[in-house]
UniProtKB/Swiss-Prot annotation:
Protein name from the UniProt record: Polyamine aminopropyltransferase
UniProt-listed NCBIfam families: MFS_SpdSyn, PRK00811.1, speE
Function statement: Catalyzes the irreversible transfer of a propylamine group from the amino donor S-adenosylmethioninamine (decarboxy-AdoMet) to putrescine (1,4-diaminobutane) to yield spermidine.
Positions that bind S-methyl-5'-thioadenosine: Q46, E121, N152, G153
Origin species: Thermotoga petrophila (strain ATCC BAA-488 / DSM 13995 / JCM 10881 / RKU-1)
Stored PANTHER family: SPERMIDINE SYNTHASE, SPERMIDINE/SPERMINE SYNTHASE
Length: 296
């Protein structure tokens, strides 16, 4: 494993060093100015880059794909975590697969009912880099309720039966690295088996515009396993299309019928994106999304 190292000087602004990310198909993309390179490393699994942008703050990238920026990461992490957390009647034990930056863990730990949160990350260097350079998202790593496991999530979850109240899949892009293992029907079945009878599940399922193939495939596979499967959407400004999809699933809990808005209204921790109105609205899908999912 490569040792973490810091870059000792800022890059000269006149050099105009830019970060380019190409979306699926390589015809559209995102570019960000690099003010300062903070860290760059290569694990056995993937390339890790962390740099500073004047507008977005610290940016975290894996294999050239943006994972988080300081300015907008709350949008993604709050929607991925709080939708399932507020739908479970009393979430005590939570499993997060992926999410090595720590943002989803941070949001899960805002719920006082949580007694244990297991973060299963496949790449130990991501955890090490996040702990050192991504202070905003990795703040829950040392919480006494946190257990960090370095393992392949698809293999790890198979060890459990009827164990977790909530399982959250915070995977990387399925087109590169290890992310594809977390988009299989076998994996979703293992998650189903690891959940308690009243357990709930959520997963990031890509954007429904540029990544329509993966989006549809994830929904199809999850709905084969879980009797209740619902897609919901949220803004995510530095992800492809600016609109991101998540999929909620459960053995019996409905994300609209069983949602109690009073729980959100009475929540005493800071939320910058998620609220009771956003929860309900996020499950209202545009016609083009409904059509792709065969819902109209």
């Amino acid at each position: 494993m490569e040792k973490l190292k810091e870059f000792e000087r800022d890059l000269q602004p006149r050099q105009h060093l830019w970060y380019f990310e190409y979306y699926t198909g390589n015809n559209v993309g995102l570019f960000m100015k690099i003010n300062r390179m903070i860290y760059s490393g290569q694990s056995d699994i993937q390339r890790i880059d962390i740099f500073e942008n004047p507008d977005l703050g610290v940016v975290f990238s894996l294999d050239g794909i943006t994972m988080t920026t300081e300015k907008d990461e709350f949008m993604y992490h709050e929607m991925l975590a709080h939708v399932p957390m507020f739908l479970h009647p009393n979430p005590k034990k939570v499993l997060i697969i992926g999410g090595g930056d720590g943002g989803t863990l941070r949001e899960v730990l805002k719920h006082d009912s949580v007694e244990k949160a297991v973060l299963c990350e496949v790449d130990g260097l991501v955890i090490e880099a996040a702990r050192k350079y991504l202070k905003q998202t990795s703040c829950g790593f040392d919480d006494p309720r946190t257990e960090i496991v370095i393992a392949n999530g698809a293999e790890y979850v198979r060890k459990f039966k009827n164990e977790f109240d909530v399982i959250i899949i915070d995977s990387t892009d399925p087109t590169a690295g290890q992310g594809g293992h977390l988009f299989t029907e076998e994996f979703y079945q293992a998650c189903y088996d690891a959940l308690k009878e009243d357990g709930v599940f959520s997963a990031e399922t890509e954007d429904p515009f540029y990544d329509i193939g993966w989006f549809k495939l994830a929904y199809k596979r999850i709905s084969k396993v879980f009797p209740i499967t619902k897609v919901y959407l949220g803004f995510m400004t530095t992800y492809p299309s600016g609109m991101w999809s998540y999929t909620f699933a459960s053995k019996g809990i409905d994300p609209i019928k069983d949602f109690n808005p009073e729980k959100v209204k009475n929540f005493n921790k800071e939320l910058k994106y998620y609220n009771e109105e956003v929860h309900v609205a996020s499950f209202a899908l545009p016609n083009f999304v409904k059509k792709e999912l065969g819902l109209m």
